[in-house]
Amino acid sequence: MPAFSQATDLSAWKELQEHHTAVGRNIVLKEAFEKDPQRFEKFSRTFKNTVDNSDILFDFSKNFLTEETLSLLVKLAKEANVEELRDAMFKGEHINFTEDRAVYHAALRNVSNEPMQVDGKSVVEDVNSVLEHMKEFSEQVRSGEWKGYTDKKIDTIINIGIGGSDLGPVMVTEALKPYGAPGMKLHFVSNIDGTHIAEALKDSNPETTLFLIASKTFTTAETTTNANSAKKWFLETAKDESHIAKHFVALSTNEAEVTKFGIDKKNMFGFESWVGGRYSVWSAIGLSVALYIGYDNFHQFLAGAQAMDKHFREAPLEQNIPAIGGLLSVWYSDFFGAQTHLVAPFDQYLHRFPAYLQQLSMESNGKAITRSGEYVKYTTGPILFGEPATNAQHSFFQLLHQGTKLIPSDFIMAAESHNPVEGGKHQRMLASNFLAQSEALMVGKTPEQVKTEGAPDNLVPHKTFLGNRPTTSILAQKITPSTLGALIAYYEHLTFTEGAVWNINSFDQWGVELGKVLAKKIQQELETSGAGAGHDASTSGLLAAFKQKANLA
C-alpha cells in the first residue's frame, strides 16, 4: 500500500503548485504551437492495437502541457507509487482493502492465458471455463439449436440488471451494433419503474424471448423485482414452470437463489468476487454482448482490452497513454480548479459511452477519504458528462466556448464509418467538426477578428471567444470490437491513475448503500397506514403527499 497519506504531502505536488503559478496558468496554447512546430509530435501518443493491426492516436498537445509539466506529473506518479499499485493490481493483490478483495477484471480478458493468481490460486482455468460456457451457449442460441418451449428460435434477448450489470452491456451492444445478429432484438431493463419492463415486454413474444437475469447475488431489489415480473408475464402464456429453463438464464454466483427462481443451474454463468460491477462487462455479465455480436467478436473485444492492459503495464510513464490521461485529469482538477470532464464521441454508435464512463469514473473516484482514513485536502473525482457530437455542439458546447467554467474535454472519432453514406460525405462533415471544435476551443476569436468581420461595436464582446480551452483528441481507425475494448481499458486505467495519485480506494462504492437501506424502510411505510416515523419534516411531508396522490393514505 502507498506509504503516504495526502497527495499534497508529496514533493512533486509542491513543485507542481510552483510550476502552475509560474508557467501552467500562463500557458497560451495558440502561442505554444506558434513557438514549437513540433508540439503535436511531442505530446501525441499512438497506441498500436496488435489485435487488428490498427492504431489509435491520442493527441494530448492541446492541453496545458510543457515538457516540464509532463516531467513533474510523471514525478508525481512515481512518488505516489502509481506503478507499484498498478503492479499489485495485476498480481491479484487485495488492493480493494475496504472489502479485502483483489481487483482483477484484467484476468477476465487474459486471452493469451498468462499466469494470473489470486491468493495463490490460478484463476485462468475458471475464467476460461466460463468463457467456454458463454461461447457454447451463445452459438447455440444464435444458430437456432437452442429453442424456446414451442421449438421456435430465440429472436429477443431481454437483459435484466442494474448498474454495471446494465450500463456495460447496453453501451457495448449499441457501440457494436454493426456486428449484431440480423433480426435479433435486444432490450435492457434496469429501472424499478414499471414502465421499463412493461415497454420491453410489450415488444416481445414469450415463445421466442430469452431473459438474462444479471445479478451477482441474485438479491438486488430492482433486478429481482423485474425478474419476477418477467417470470409472471412468461408463465401467463407458457403455464408450465418447467419451461422457465429454456427462457431464463442467470448471470450470478448464488446457486441457491437461482435454482429457487426456477433456472437450471446448468444455465448459470458465474463470476468471482474480485470482479467489480463497473468492470463486469468483461465477465459473464457480457453474455448479452456475446449473444448479439457473436463469440468471436466478443473475444476480439476482450483482446483489445488486454492489448491496452499490456501497454499500461509496460510503457514508461512518459509514454504511458492511460497514465498521461489520468495525470492530466489530476492537473486540471487540483491545480486549475476544474470540476468537470467532458467526453464527446463523434460517433452515433458510441452514444451511451459517456453514460458508461460516468459510472466508471464517478463511482470509482467519488471518494473523500484517503487510504489512511483521512479526509482529503484536495479535489478528487471530476463530474463526467457527455453526449455524442455533433448533437452536443447544438446544446452545451456554448458553455465550453464562452462560459466561465474550465471544462477539459475528450473528443473521440473513428476515421472509417460503418455507414459511409453518400460516398463518405457524412463522415467527412463529421470529421470537419471533430477537427474544428478542438481548434476553435483553443484559438478562440479576438475582438479584432470580430470587428474585421463587420460586427457592430456593441456586439463585439458577445462574439469574442477567449479560446485556450484544453482538449484531448482520440482518433481511431474504426470502431471495431478490439478498438472498443482498448478504449474502455484506456479509461479504466486513466481512472486508476487518478485514484492512485489521490490515494483513495477506487474500487469500493459505499456511497451506493445508504440510500438503499433507507429505501427499504420507506417502502415498508408505503405498504402500511400512517405517515412513518423518524424522518425529517421534508421527507415526512413528501411521504404523506405521495400517499395521498397515489391513493395510499
Curated annotation (Swiss-Prot):
NCBIfam families: PRK00179.1. It catalyses: alpha-D-glucose 6-phosphate = beta-D-fructose 6-phosphate. PROSITE patterns: P_GLUCOSE_ISOMERASE_1, P_GLUCOSE_ISOMERASE_2, P_GLUCOSE_ISOMERASE_3. Its EC number is 5.3.1.9. Homodimer. GO terms for cellular component: cytosol; mitochondrion. The keyword rRNA processing does not apply. GO terms for molecular function: carbohydrate derivative binding; glucose-6-phosphate isomerase activity; monosaccharide binding. It comes from Aspergillus oryzae (strain ATCC 42149 / RIB 40) (Yellow koji mold). This is Glucose-6-phosphate isomerase. In the cytoplasm, catalyzes the conversion of glucose-6-phosphate to fructose-6-phosphate, the second step in glycolysis, and the reverse reaction during gluconeogenesis. D-glucose 6-phosphate binds at G164, S165, S215, K216, T217, F218, T219, T220, Q359, E363, H394, K516. Belongs to the GPI family. The active site is at E363, H394, K516. The lineage of its organism: Eukaryota, Fungi, Dikarya, Ascomycota, Pezizomycotina. HAMAP family: G6P_isomerase. GO terms for biological process: gluconeogenesis; glucose 6-phosphate metabolic process; glycolytic process. Pathway: Carbohydrate degradation; glycolysis; D-glyceraldehyde 3-phosphate and glycerone phosphate from D-glucose: step 2/4. It comes from the Eukaryota.
